[in-house]
Each structure stands twice: as structure tokens, then as C-alpha cells.
Amino acid sequence: MSKTSITFASIGRRIALGLVLAGFAGGAAGAAEVTFMMRNSHPNALEVELYSQDRNHVWPGNGEVYYLDDGETKQIPLSCDEGEKICYGAWVSGDKGTYWGTGPNNGEHCEDCCYTCTGGETETIDLVE
């Protein structure tokens, strides 16, 4: 093996290692977790989705919802991007016309139903009649 090929191989490995390390550092720096505390004080079961306002993302996603029985309090942990704005939409199961926050499919405007992903947990969000 010539001295030149060893030098190029060594440089290539260093570049590859640098790119891998930069990828790990970049991905981890923007990640955060927040827990939404949701309480159903309505006499009927509720369905809840959480919507990013900064990217096209819904929790839990894939056509699923978080389900809260009447009287139930649920902790909903999310992995999100640091600083991301997340709003909740909740509605009576089987009655999308009775809703809280942004409602089904993030379709309504709301006041005080959005939180910034900075870690920790929200105060208890009480969904009342």
C-alpha cells in the first residue's frame, strides 16, 4: 500500500466520523419531551389529538386518538422539537360538533389551547361541559 492511499483512507475515515458525530449532535439538540395532562370533566367520553403548528405532525397519528373516559385524567407524553408550538383538539366521542381547543382535525382557532415544547408537563387541562 502506498503512503498516499493510507493518507486518503485516513482522511476519509475522519470525515465520515465527523459527519456521524455531527448528525448525532444535531438530532439530539432539537429534541424535547412534554407531557400533556388532560382531565375529562364532561359526562361523556372524549377523543383528543395534539397538533404541531410548526410542521405537519399529529399525535398519536395514523388515524388514532387518545381516548378519555368520563372522569379520567390522562398523562400524554410527546417527543417534540424544542420550541415547537403544539395545540390540543378534543371532542365528544361520536359528536365532533362538541369540541375544545382546535377541535377535530385542528380545524378551529382557539385561545389558551397551545403550548410550547420546552420539556416538563402542562398544567392539568380540564375539559368541562
Predicted regions and their residues:
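Short, surface-exposed binding/anchoring microloops in extracellular/periplasmic proteins
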Residues: G30-E82
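Bacterial N-terminal signal peptides that target proteins for export
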Residues: S2-A16
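Structured interaction patches on ligand/partner-binding surfaces of diverse proteins
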Residues: V92-E129
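A short, solvent-exposed beta-strand micro-motif common in secreted/extracellular proteins
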Residues: E82-G94
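Sec/Tat signal peptide C-region and signal peptidase I cleavage site
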Residues: I15, G26-A31
